[in-house]
Amino acid sequence: GDITTGKNRLIFEVAVRFVNNFLAQEKELLTDTNNQLKILATEETLATELRIEGIDYPVKIHGQVDRVDELNGVLRIIDYKTGMVSSSDLRVAAFERLREKEQYKAIQVLLYAYLYTKSKKYHFKQPLQAGIYSFKNLQSGFLPVDFSSNYRNPAVEITSEKLEKFIFEKKKILKEI
């Protein structure tokens, strides 16, 4: 529709403000000469196949990751959200709980991390994180998945073991379907 008037104009103005605020935050990050940021991919489609015991054919999974970057040697898989996201939305204290509806944001970015590691044959030679930039919570910056039950002592690095536990739980769900 026409973005010069009415509701469409308001939505457009909000989107412009979100983008400008985000870019200002990125610029601020880069004013510190110690920070090294490389954007490796945007809007990248990733795919792989899962072999599940008891299912006679491979299950294809895919997703489109908003951004892959490297910040100070840490590879980050990033999803942008226009809505409100807080760090508690990305806390994964137990992989078995990843069936719960409120865990969908963590599930999404962990799935992107899994897809990235499989489709790019990633060997975990550098730290890996997955998380969200929430445009309604930009002051919190990049919100990574946190595997710690103690918010004061975060555990945000994704290892191959953590991804295997994650995908094991997803395979259990697929077997039930």
Identify the residue ranges that each predicted region occupies:
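Structural signature of nuclease core domains in nucleic-acid processing machines
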Residues: 1-177
